[in-house]
Amino acid sequence: MKDSDVIVSDITPAPVIPNYAADNLTGIIPGCLLGMPSQRPQWFPQPLQDAERIVLLVIDGLGYEQLQSHAHLAPHLMSLEGRSITTIAPSTTASALTSLVTGASPAEHGIVGYRMDMGDSVMNSLRWWSDTRDLRKVHPPATVQTIPPFVGMSIPVVSRTELEGSAFTEAHLRGSRPCGWRAASSIVAQCTQLIASGEKFVYAYYDGVDKIAHERGFGAYY
């Protein structure tokens, strides 16, 4: 590989400390579900302040800075109103998704990283496995992560069908109503149908960008 083949993205030059009391990932869902439109957090974009029905589309692996540096590839997303907020630490998928849906920091909900020391083993929190065995019976997801997602409400979740019933799904999405998709093109159709049926809040999750970033980095494939 030549130096000219390397794509350098602009990133924050120093670590950012999460501000859990202000404009942070943990405040999104409580702000959407607990407040009336006129009572939502002031850092919410105005369209979200006024919205009576909300679809929260989580694009894993697409941060604000990545979106800015790839703006030409996402003109519709760039046309939407918004700004950067802080995430949690560590900002790995398992911890961040759990913080998003519970409104709690990793220290509070217990999913503190991609791998966790469980005393008798080191557990991959997305797979709920050690190097040798399934840990679902040894460490039940609902006892590892005890905070109810979506402030205790039963919310429709539009995500990959194969994620339904997994231990990590039980840990961070239990009590929700799964609406699985097999092709990403189904996400919009399913969300539209749910809103048309009267749902006030829909949670949708797409992991394709994150997978590409892990496998190929932030270059031409991203």
Where are these regions (language model features)?
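His/Asp/Glu-rich, glycine-adjacent segments
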Residues: 2-37, 71-82, 88-200, 205-216
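An N-terminal domain-cap segment
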Residues: 36-50
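Catalytic cores of glycan-processing enzymes that make or break glycosidic bonds
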Residues: 50-53, 103
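Short hydrophobic beta-strand that contains or immediately precedes a catalytic carboxylate
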Residues: 56-59
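Short acidic, Gly/Ser-rich segments with clustered Asp/Glu that frequently serve as metal-coordination loops
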Residues: 61-65
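Short, solvent-exposed loop/turn and secondary-structure capping segments
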Residues: 66-70
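Acidic, glycine-rich loop-and-beta core segments that form the ion-binding/anion-interacting portion
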Residues: 217-222
